[in-house]
């Protein structure tokens, strides 16, 4: 920063007592007050003898909870309060998850998050509620189908008419929501309506018919249709494509995809049995294990993201606070039928089974 900081007094702390001292020598642990520009991680030194230390390595926060204001209208206060707290604590992080419409508070462990909420109430007078986060599930299909979509509305004057026949199949690319193609011959659907048909597909992919999650890995092809020279419109063809999509999707063996994380767990050898057993109970798949240069065991596994909720606390309990872990998103895979039952209504499950 190369900024000047004026320090009037220095102190040492002994329990709850703050004792003013004339100086602090090398090796002393002391305190200063009313710093205007200094933040956590900064180095304070004399201009005549500048000393710059490397910033300390900060542990990556993996524990997170969904948070929300208990009182409507406190959102701005909470945002500014958390910004100040993150300047003090570099392991604290806030993420705005727009996809799932939630705000996430990250920290090193559950206790840190609870202390943060307590500080928000005590210091900044804002009350925050923590809850289990939502996870980024996806929807896709397993087989190719053809489906019609016909939208017709007459209410005096010009009506609305759009008629399409489409095919839907897996694209093989779960990173992309959809691929759109058209194979219409003979002008059955005028070209100027193709973008409206694609728009209908695009909007359907943002909230899938199965459980309301985003759709991925689908190829939609416009095959045929019909139009009316007066009543047809872009809106009518978009609605027709929407009807075709919803019917075709539910006929094409739809499945729910859950996010999978690649996890590395570092523990002393004596805890490996308990840790691996716990990973299996969390529907994890252990990929391998090897020793690091400190003599500890590194367990690598794939595990559903939803099963990592609360893992930090459980790992510390199993290993006496010694175990460490890190993870990153790997891919999405088909969720087991038991999870599907928890996510879907009876009516939707019955509709899926009827098409198997």
Task: Enumerate the language-model features and the residues they cover.
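Accessory interaction regions appended to the cores of large information-processing enzymes
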Residues: 1-356
